[in-house]
Amino acid sequence: MRFSKLFMSAALALTMSAFTAMAGKPEAERWINSEFQPSAFSKAQQMAEMEWFIKAAEPFKGMEINVLSETIPTHSYESKVLTKAFEEITGIKVNHQLLGEGEVVQAVQTQMQT
């Protein structure tokens, strides 16, 4: 629970950037047809969900999100694959830093004190 709160605090640290990206349905379709298969959802259901993400992300396109996570296999996959998908689909760049558990706790505590 404590780690979840720390992770969420780190994930919510947003910064503006001059970054622009192509984002939208063609990118979502490409990810749905490749990395996001197999799925319990049909491709049409996945696309409906992606359309919601695209629309919800529109006001934030061009922003940059800094995420700090513990180095575990799930977070490594998120950092290497899902951050790229998220950026291509939403136009929001993700900087995903992976550290050991103690380093994550220390980094978040330092950030909270500043």
Where in the sequence are the language-model features?
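Conserved N-terminal structural module of periplasmic/extracytoplasmic solute-binding proteins
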Residues: M22-T114
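N-terminal export/targeting leaders of redox proteins
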Residues: K5, A18-A23
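Bacterial N-terminal signal peptides that target proteins for export
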Residues: M1-M8
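Bacterial N-terminal signal peptides
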Residues: S9-A18
